[in-house]
Amino acid sequence: MKQDLQQFFITYNVFKQLDIDRIGVFGSYARGENYKDIDLLLDKDPGYQKRELLKSLVEKNFQIPCDIVIKDKLEPIILHYVNKDLLYVKGR
């Protein structure tokens, strides 16, 4: 799972395009329970257009919905639950 995403992010040069070092994966996809969607956490907001580009690339290539959240925009209680199964995919 994590390796698939990492290879995908490297292939599409996502880390450089978004100017980020890592992308968090959480939820059911991170736990390997089912693959109904992919939840991604970004440490900083790359802007609307870049978020939408990432979302469309993930959805097109994995054929499932993708949700993207920004870490500093989450309520602390939500971040607590996100952190329980958060895995980071590192790009550089």
Predicted segments, located by residue:
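Catalytic core of pol beta-like nucleotidyltransferases
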Residues: M1-V25, A30-Y35, D43-R92
